[in-house]
Amino acid sequence: VQRLPQYAIDKLELADVHRLSRGARIKVAVIDSGIDTSHPELAGALDRSGDMLTGQPARDADADSHGTGMASAVFARSQLTGVAPAASLLAVRAFKGTTTGDRSGAQGTSWHVLKGIDWSVAEGARVLNLSFAGPRDELVSRALAAASGRGVIAVAAAGNAGPASAPLFPASDPNVIAVTALDAENKVFAMANRGRHIAVAAPGVDVLVAQPSAGYGMTTGTSVATAHVSGLVALLIERDARLDLPQVRTLLTGTARDLGAPGRDAETGAGLINIRAALARMTQVR
């Protein structure tokens, strides 16, 4: 199989990391727009799908570029390499319509997100990928708290509303790991939201991902950075299923590569995720 170029593979040291963990048997729910689960990059990844808009299993006919791209950043296993290529996909459609760029959040409701979280937890998800951002919702916040209490780790995109924007939800919620985006030179994405709630940063500018109908394309934003971190969390949980949200947050922020001014900051949180260091620290902690 011809491999396609991905700078994130080297930046995240995936060749070395995958000798230690590939996310086997860990269910990661991608709560997003429709996912083309028939894409070669996602072959064999699907565990179950649910369409929160219809109450039925999700259909590949409703696949969208955003959801498909996010799923491939986690699970890709053909010409691309996902962060957790052996993990199991829970494909959760909570947003409808064709997305433009990184704006899938404009076409969903808190109710569909809420149903998606509950469905994912009931299906045994250990990781929730939340690559969307908007206004705070109390019911969704309660659902995230309940999920965390059951050992589920939610990872959320900081948002792409620019440095002057107020913190967006669910990234601003205490029961998620908030992620921002970096380019190949480790510069923060110019339109990423800033804030003290941001935990870590990951590759998120000009990232090659899968697109519907066996296609490929580039995506930029905190969404795909979040998917990279969700994959990392699956790798950690494969190594130790007892990990909870506070432990995962401590592992990620404690091993991240500091960027910018020394210490944690509103631009990049604790810095660039360091998967190898996080896995190594786990073995020391346990």
Predicted regions located by residue number:
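Anionic-ligand binding region
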Residues: A184-I198, G215
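Subtilisin-like serine protease catalytic core
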Residues: D16-R48, A58-T109, D173-N175, N193-H197, ...
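Substrate-binding/access-modulating region of protease and related hydrolase catalytic domains
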Residues: F95-P174, K187-V188, P212-T220, V224-T226, ...
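Solvent-exposed, polar/charged alpha-helical surfaces in well-ordered, non-transmembrane soluble domains
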Residues: A15, R19, P40, T68-S72, ...
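Non-catalytic propeptide/linker segments at domain boundaries
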Residues: V1-Q6
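Sec-exported extracytoplasmic/periplasmic mature domains
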Residues: R22, I35, D47, F75-Q79, ...
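Structural recognition of the beta-strand scaffold that forms the well-ordered cores
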Residues: K27-I31, G82, S88-R93, V121, ...
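Hydrolase catalytic cores
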Residues: A73, A94-F95, A190, G204-L272, ...
